[in-house]
Swiss-Prot record:
It comes from Dictyostelium discoideum. This is Transmembrane protein DDB_G0274347. Residues 37-145, 550-576 are annotated as: Disordered. Its main location: membrane. It is found in: Membrane. Residues 85-99 have a biased composition (Basic and acidic residues).
Length: 704
């Protein structure tokens, strides 16, 4: 029917072109078009009835998808011929419209053409509206009508792909399939697709704990940064003001402990006697030591006798030879201090009394060298751990959480424990290299020991010709031997670890004790050599913040005066310059040098230079004048007293600096301190008023 109607319309249109004055033909065309529109309305009503029936069967989600899919297919099949026919009809009508537009007709004919065109446009609009209505009905059945909520930000919907062949829905990614959710959690449950919220509500107590932990973490981070860069602490006067009491207490504790060590060292040197010895022979093949049968040898000296110089020289030379023999026997013999002991009994130097050797080692010497190396590692690890613990205690002081027991423990570790462990570590390192290089695998037994002793004796004799090294070594030997002779007296042969006295297995533990003492003696020489070298090095490579800050401030002032001369008359700038804080006034690492003349360098008042200067004066006096012979004291022992003065000088120096700059730090801290909110607002208001007043005065000066 539709096709026949369109054919008739085409014929009628052609007739209209030939007979424009025939109104009856136009009326017939309009009636036929209205019949076509009525037929399309009937088809659309049938489609709407089918869709309403599909909406009633919407219980299951999967069934609904299939129904919608089939309905789309049915509508597509039914509407396609009509759409094709409508397209053809539109094209023909457009052609007719163009022909009407191109033709030159009368006014009456134009009116008829406009009537025809308006009717065609209305019909086209009706067709488009019907198509849009069908599409809207389909979309309304498949899309939610509610607006999108803000929580969709946290929603992770599944990507569902429709299988056009079977008409089923497959879940590609995101979430679970609808059947699993319905079985476990009920219909329309998509709770697993919501990510858990990060905004968790916590209690007030947990909030306080979190803020406390965060504060402690930031303080520890600050303490580590200050420990790596000590000058950072001088940039905060609040920080320095709060920590002044802690620093003063710590320095007093260190000063008291240093004073106690100094007094005990003086008592050992002046009140504990040395063991008597004479006729020290350097030959390793024969008896190397002869004991003194007479006591009070030095009491029989006549100091007015000119020949006393030879006897004093013999005294010094005997102790020099004794120290060389003792060190050689310690480094080359079988009785070496070793926590991982390689033998249980004495011997003649061949196998150390231990006959059972593991298969991995060909000789006892290999096992011995390995255990000495293990002892080096052991003491190195212990030293490192103790140093870390002492550093941690120093950080506690930096973050103002150090109490008196912690400060006392830190002082004991840094003044006693760490130096003693360093001595043991360096002595074992030297022992390992000597045992490995000079003795090796001990193929020839006793001959290798004599070879090692001979080489070491010659080397140490050459080193002892340098008087500072000789006196430093004799000082450590004299202090240790005084302690042993007073608390646990032994023979000279035992103290020198002479090989002929070691056959008795009953004296094994006694020899181990003496070996431990020689370990301290050798380590003390190495440790104090490094200590003196570090003080000498620090004089020329010490950081001087005062000089750098003064130079930078002078450069800044010169540049400001040259570039902005007009600001000199500004009272506001003058007031700001007068209130500027000099960073050198807060530096707790150097003295205030304002009292010094300009031609004197600041390095002369640093603590390291003062300590080295005292050591130099003491060594020069001891070298020139010596020690009175009636004291029976080595010059090296007196020099150790001045070495023990170094921690005390440091503590006194730091206390002087703090006392010198304490008032300035507290003054600035009180002027610009942490205040409550009303006080801060009042202070800001006062400053704003003062700035406005200064600006007015400055403007008046410019106008004048």
């Amino acid at each position: 029917m539709v096709r026949k109607a369109t054919k008739k319309t085409i014929k009628k249109v052609k007739q209209v072109e030939e007979f424009n004055d025939d109104d009856e033909i136009i009326e017939e065309i309009v009636e036929e078009i209205e019949e076509v529109v009525e037929q399309r309305d009937e088809v659309n009503d049938e489609f709407q009835e089918e869709e309403e029936e599909l909406e009633d069967d919407d219980d299951d989600e999967d069934d609904e998808d299939e129904i919608v899919f089939t309905s789309i297919r049915t509508t597509a099949t039914t509407t396609t011929p009509i759409n094709q026919h409508n397209d053809k009809e539109k094209e023909k009508k457009k052609d007719k419209q163009e022909e009407y537009i191109d033709s030159d007709d009368d006014d009456d004919d134009d009116g008829d053409e406009n009537y025809y065109l308006n009717n065609n446009n209305n019909n086209n609009n009706n067709i488009n509206n019907n198509n849009n209505y069908n599409n809207n009905n389909y979309n309304n059945n498949n899309t939610p009508t509610e607006p999108i909520k803000t929580e969709t930000i946290f929603y992770n919907p599944p990507i569902r792909k429709r299988n056009e062949i079977n008409g089923t829905v497959n879940t590609v990614s995101g979430g679970k399939s609808s059947k699993n959710i319905i079985e476990k959690m009920g219909e329309q449950s998509w709770g697993d697709m919501y990510t858990p919220s990060k905004c968790l509500q916590i209690s007030k107590q947990n909030c306080e704990l979190q803020s406390k932990y965060y504060t402690e973490a930031q303080l520890e981070r600050l303490s580590s940064e200050i420990r790596r860069n000590p000058s950072m602490a001088s940039k905060s006067y609040h920080f320095l003001s709060l920590g002044l009491t802690t620093k003063i207490n710590h320095q007093w504790i260190r000063a008291l402990i240093s004073m106690a060590l100094l007094i005990s060292l003086v008592a050992i040197i002046f009140y504990l006697p040395l063991p008597h010895l004479k006729h020290i022979i350097m030959s390793p093949t024969g008896p190397s030591i002869q004991t003194s049968k007479t006591t009070g040898e030095f009491d029989q000296f006549d100091f007015n006798n000119p020949s006393i110089a030879t006897k004093l020289t013999a005294f010094k030379d005997n102790w020099r030879r004794f120290s060389i023999v003792g060190v050689s026997n310690f480094l080359c013999s079988n009785y070496n201090f070793n926590p991982i002991d390689y033998s249980d009994g004495g011997g003649d130097g061949g196998d150390g009394g231990n006959t059972s050797i593991p298969k991995e080692f060909s000789t006892v010497q290999e096992l011995k060298n390995l255990k000495i190396f293990g002892s080096c590692i052991l003491f190195g690890v212990i030293l490192f751990v103790v140093w870390l613990f002492a550093t941690r205690l120093a950080e506690k002081e930096i973050i103002i959480k150090s109490n008196l027991p912690l400060q006392f423990l830190h002082s004991i570790l840094t003044l006693l424990v760490i130096p003693l462990l360093s001595m043991l570590f360096w002595s074992l390192v030297l022992l390992y290299f000597i045992q490995t290089l000079l003795i090796g695998n001990q193929v020839n037994g006793q001959e290798d020991i004599f070879y090692c002793v001979n080489h070491l004796s010659n080397s140490l004799s050459e080193i002892s010709s340098f008087s500072p090294a000789r006196e430093l070594f004799l000082g450590s030997v004299g202090i240790v031997m005084r302690l042993v002779n007073y608390f646990y007296p032994l023979s000279i042969e035992s103290l020198a670890l002479h090989q002929s006295t070691l056959y008795d297995t009953k004296n094994v533990y006694q020899m181990k004790l003496v070996s431990f003492l020689w370990t301290i003696i050798v380590g003390s020489f190495i440790y104090h050599t490094f200590l003196i070298s570090s003080y000498l090095y620090s004089i020329f490579h010490e950081y001087h913040p005062t000089t750098t800050t003064t130079t930078t401030t002078t450069i800044n002032t010169t540049t400001n005066t040259t570039s902005n001369t007009s600001q000199q008359s500004n009272p506001l700038s003058k007031r700001l310059k007068s209130n500027q804080i000099d960073p050198s006034s807060f530096n707790l690492f150097s003295l205030d040098v304002k009292f010094l003349p300009s031609f004197i360098p600041e390095v002369l008042i640093t603590q390291n230079f003062i300590i080295v200067f005292i050591w130099t004066i003491a060594a020069s006096l001891l070298w020139i004048y010596g020690v009175p012979p009636n004291l029976h004291i080595h010059e090296g022992e007196i020099f150790f007293i001045f070495i023990a003065l170094a921690p005390l000088i440091k503590s006194i120096y730091n206390l002087i600096i703090i006392e010198q700059k304490k008032d300035k730090i507290n003054q600035v801290h009180n002027e610009i301190s942490w205040k409550s909110e009303p006080e801060i607002l009042e202070l800001q208001r006062q400053r704003l008023e003062q700035d406005q007043l200064d600006q007015q005065q400055f403007d008046e000066l410019i106008d004048n």
